């Protein structure tokens, strides 16, 4: 294997990955005795439940010791809240749903986009979208207020951290759009 160049090794690995992907896809073909593909998956869930699952997937679990002031699936601990070191999944789920419900109420006036905006605000904070003394109102919100529906680019612009586009955040935004955007 020493005589193989990096380029050849890369091609071999890609070929093996494509072969494995093909085999996996063949194993997932529906049969007559199994439920149809449309009956399965996240799109069968109500939009709010899709939003909760998406947040849980991308936020991951926050331990109070390592991630203070965040806990559970990204709940920010407020000054009046006291939590024990071992937060249960049930309590964390309740906190996430409560936070998301509050954000939905905050964006209620935006109608069918309120859940999408709430999920974005859960990650970046509501004032990066709504604007305040530190941040101007986002272009995304301005477009929604004008009734424009081509908001994909503006939504995907929220994938920056320290002025760099972060691929993992971009994937998250694309997933959120696919799950929650209503054209």
Residue ranges of model-derived segments:
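Short N-proximal segments of mature Sec-exported proteins
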Residues: 114-128
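Early exported N-terminus immediately downstream of N-terminal targeting peptides
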Residues: 67-71, 75
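Long, amphipathic alpha-helical surface segments
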Residues: 26-62, 75-80, 86-106, 128-183
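Bacterial N-terminal signal peptides
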Residues: 11-21
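Surface-exposed patches in mature extracellular/periplasmic domains of secreted proteins
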Residues: 62-67, 107-116
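Bacterial N-terminal signal peptides that target proteins for export
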Residues: 1-12
């Amino acid at each position: 294997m020493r005589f193989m160049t990096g380029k050849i090794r890369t091609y071999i690995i890609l070929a093996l990955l494509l072969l494995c992907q093909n085999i996996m896809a063949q194993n997932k073909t529906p049969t007559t005795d199994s439920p149809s593909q449309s009956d399965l998956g996240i799109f069968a869930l109500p939009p709010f439940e899709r939003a909760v699952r998406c947040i849980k997937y991308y936020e991951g679990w926050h331990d109070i010791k390592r991630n203070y002031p965040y806990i559970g699936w990204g709940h920010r601990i407020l000054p009046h809240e006291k939590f024990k070191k071992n937060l249960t999944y049930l309590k964390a789920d309740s906190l996430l749903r409560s936070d998301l419900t509050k954000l939905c109420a905050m964006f209620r006036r935006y109608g069918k986009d309120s859940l999408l905006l709430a999920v974005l605000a859960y990650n970046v904070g509501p004032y990066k979208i709504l604007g305040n003394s530190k941040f101007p109102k986002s272009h995304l919100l301005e477009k929604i207020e004008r009734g424009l529906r081509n908001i994909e680019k503006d939504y995907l612009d929220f994938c920056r951290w320290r002025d760099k586009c972060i691929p993992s955040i971009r994937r998250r935004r694309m997933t959120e759009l696919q799950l929650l955007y209503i054209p």
